[in-house]
Amino acid sequence: MGSNSSKISDLPKNEYLKRLSGPEAISENDPFWNQLFSFSFSAPTSSTELKLLEEATISVCKSLVENNPRTGNLAALTKVFLARTRELRLSAECQNHIFIWQTHNALFIICCLLKVFICEMSEEELQLHFTYEEKLPGTYTLCVLLGSDSEDLLEELLCSLIQLITDTPLLDITYEISVEAISAMIVFLSCQLFHKEVLRQSISHKYLMQGPCLPYTSKLVKTLLYNFIRQEKPPPPGTHVFPQQSDGGGLLYGLASGVATGLWTVFTLGGVGSKAASPELTSPLANQSLLLLLVLVNLTDAPDIPNPYRQAVTSFKNTQDSSPFPSSVPHTFQINFNSLYTTLCEQQTSDQATLLLYTLLHQNANVRTYMLARTDMENLVLPILEILYHVEERNSHHVYMALIILLILTEDDGFNRSIHEVILKNITWYSERVLTEISLGSLLILVVIRTIQYNMTRTRDKYLHTNCLAALANMSAQFRSLHQYAAQRIISLFSLLSKKHNKVLEQATQSLRGSLSSSDVPLPDYAQDLSVIEEVIRMMLEIINSCLTNSLHHNPNLVYALLYKRDLFEQFRTHPSFQDIMQNIDLVISFFSSRLLQSGAELSVERVLEIIKQGVVALPKDRLKKFPELKFKYVEEEQPEEFFIPYVWSLVYNSAVGLYWNPQDIQLFAMDSD
């Protein structure tokens, strides 16, 4: 490659890489390793740059695959790295920049090679490559794994990465190696990307769920969570770990000099400080930590061993909680819930933060109880509502997660009451109407109804409808002081459903007539469409009825909207599917219509509301028929991993810092999906 070369495409010609991947065995104490690890460059950031690096690595790997059975150089490289990691903590404490820099570079090389190996070969073949040792010329064998002196180098490497993540103090000089270790663990598990089916057993599963890695479970999960919570930014370029060149030059690359004699010269590709990072990537460490955490939590259970990382995530407690952990709960730890809550509120623009929030609310009772007791729930709910409001800009999975979070929250009556007590001013992102003052509860209703209407006209996803309506139903008995616009939108949605019902009914009638005259043409299933729309209408009527039955006196604006559009409900009074639920609505409409009639014509809005408020007191409550309380609970579908594992890996594919996979190699999810 030479000291002046700066192109990634030159990497396969580089003398050090050629020697590593060539036919000559390199012993672990050869000075070559220091030379190999003494490079510096601005890390590739764009997909184009990362693709070039990947292609260059593939070329090196082909040679290594061919020669490694004779040389054992992959094992030697790994052992040199492992020896260095044992001294890493001391080096950090002693501010040994050069040692940390070289160890980072060793890990970077291993990670690049590992990524290509995992894509190109089976796990068994990969494991085999880590067992080859240096042999006499003309012969090659592998270590006998079952022998008394055998070692599983791949497992040792994974354990070393976990220890590096959990035990290395986070300093400016260790930031990059911490990120690289997390990236390497993601790469280690990336074999899932190259399988259409969800992997239920693999070598990496075995390593992580039993053996020497297992005791680090809670420590690893806690570290990854705190990395996410702290959102540590990378050190400024001036405090980079790469050492400045001394007068003698030697093997070290000087950042300012533009001269290098190590493996790679500076890649003039940009990097830290070259361009403004997107908001999600202001902390590569936090981003990468969260992605790894989600991957670990969503690993499938082993046949006889539940996923320990999921156990850790579902059972951790607040640092202020002094109660003992149940003895039956493994992998326990404590974390600062206030800090966790604050970061979750701030980071909801990303899919992965929303997925973490969902996971914690759904599976960790301690977190759920804590969050529902907060007096500032608007900080959490508003970002979720904003995701739903901009539904057309979000992928469907992100929208689902946001909706399910709302559904889980609305299972709690205390939440449903408190959101109507929180008054918000000037919601700038809500553009359909100026909302100078509105309760959080009314805003939630507006956004959920808007999501339903969007779904009706665009995606027509029944699953989306069901979750939206379930959240509204859970809230309905606790509706309080609904904003007039929220009340109008409830009735407007019913109006839209009514028109859709009439249209489908007309189409079904015409279709039936057509079928009588011609039996050859296949007809659309309007009966199915009608059944679905009637189910949704029934749900809306139950929501309105629930509010009228339980909190009529708190909601004059809903009664006003009901009276204003009373004709809408006429056609459903005698409909067999809605007769029972229409009784109370019909009674309320009749009662208040009569009182308005008695008060004369040309009444102002203020006067009508006054009559409604007076009438509420006079309405005989015993005449309202009681219905079972509307309560819906979110339950994960069977085999949730079929949804979550492809989703998590799509987030890794799209959001991981500095990791690139060829889209043509991806089997787990469709590349054209959102």
From Swiss-Prot:
Source organism phylogeny: Eukaryota, Metazoa, Chordata, Craniata, Vertebrata
Keyword Nucleotide-binding: no
Pfam family of the protein (one): Dymeclin
Subunit structure: Interacts with GOLM1 and PPIB.
Family statement: Belongs to the dymeclin family.
Keyword Cytoplasm found: yes
Compartments, as annotated in UniProt: Cytoplasm; Golgi apparatus; Membrane
UniProt GO BP: bone development; Golgi organization
Function: Necessary for correct organization of Golgi apparatus. Involved in bone development.
Annotated GO CC locations: cytoplasm; Golgi apparatus; membrane
PANTHER family, A to Z: DYMECLIN (PTHR12895:SF9)
Molecular functions per Gene Ontology: enzyme binding
Alphabetic keyword roster: Cytoplasm, Golgi apparatus, Lipoprotein, Membrane, Myristate
Residues lipid-modified (N-myristoyl glycine): G2
Post-translational events: Myristoylated in vitro; myristoylation is not essential for protein targeting to Golgi compartment.
Membrane topology: Lipid-anchor
Protein name: Dymeclin
Gene: Dym
